[in-house]
């Protein structure tokens, strides 16, 4: 079996390493991979960008790849799974529509509200003044989120009106996150520990996997700005 892993981070290195442990896997390719995956047995990096879907399809077809596993959110939101499936290629990941739950915070929050799934109160804004007035009305602390993908850095916890105003202006007027910040979701600040419960679904069946806890703050003690993730561990003790 030949496997393609799409992405360049530690997540993709871990996926590639695990796939390479199976006897039935003869070769794992990572597009584009990183310095760590380049050193592993049975693993080869290829110089194809993770968002270059036509080039990825061409590689899969030319190398007779048995299954592709997608790591990053961006190609999923672009519809890589749909395009692979249209070509009859095996790929693991959510469809373009399902990926909007990750790709658009407004889409996700609206989905939760529409289906009566508990979530923090929120509003969506495209203009700065109404957004700032909403913050004044709701009080602090409050959470300002760029609607789209921002490499895990599009969430600001504002403890003062000045911080909230700066974040809103930065996203909506300053174009800090480009198209991803053309809308902002302003959300209630919830206290407590955050954890993820990961399941696989196919539309009919649910397969529970594992719990995980991501740590995004840059500095020790959960301080500093959010990053794409300083580290994570699984299972998460906070989930019983």
Where in the sequence are the language-model features?
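Short acidic-hydrophobic, aromatic-tinged amphipathic segments that line or gate anion-handling sites
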Residues: 45-51, 123-127, 158
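Short, charged, surface-exposed secondary-structure boundary motifs
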Residues: 39-41, 55-57, 100-106, 219-221
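Internal nucleotide-binding/catalytic subdomain
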Residues: 158-240
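A conserved helix-loop-beta module that forms one wall/lid of the active-site cleft
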Residues: 92-154
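General beta-strand structural signal in soluble alpha/beta enzymes
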Residues: 5, 30-31, 69-70, 91-94, ...
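ATP-binding N-terminal substructure of ATP-dependent carboxylate-amine bond-forming enzymes
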Residues: 1-96
């Amino acid at each position: 079996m030949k496997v393609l892993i799409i992405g360049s981070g530690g997540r993709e290195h871990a996926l590639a390493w695990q796939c390479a442990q199976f006897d039935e896997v003869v070769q794992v390719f990572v597009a584009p991979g990183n310095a760590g995956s380049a050193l592993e047995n049975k693993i080869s990096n290829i110089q194809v960008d993770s968002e270059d879907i036509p080039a990825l399809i061409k590689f899969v077809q030319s190398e007779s790849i048995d299954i592709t596993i997608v790591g990053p959110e961006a190609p999923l939101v672009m519809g890589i799974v749909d395009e692979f499936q249209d070509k009859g290629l095996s790929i693991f990941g959510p469809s373009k529509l399902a990926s909007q739950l990750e790709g658009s915070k407004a889409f996700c929050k609206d989905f939760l509200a529409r289906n009566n799934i508990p979530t923090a109160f929120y509003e969506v804004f495209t203009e700065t003044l109404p957004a700032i007035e909403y913050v004044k009305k709701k009080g602090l602390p409050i959470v300002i989120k760029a609607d789209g993908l921002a490499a895990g850095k599009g969430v600001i916890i504002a403890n003062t009106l000045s911080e909230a105003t700066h974040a809103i202006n930065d996203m909506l007027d300053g174009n800090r996150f480009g198209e991803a910040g053309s809308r902002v979701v302003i959300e209630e600040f919830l206290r407590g520990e955050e954890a993820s419960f990961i399941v696989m679904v196919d539309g009919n069946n649910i397969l529970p996997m594992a719990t995980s806890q991501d740590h995004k703050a840059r500095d020790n003690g959960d301080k500093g700005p959010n990053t794409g993730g300083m580290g994570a561990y699984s299972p998460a003790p906070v989930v019983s």
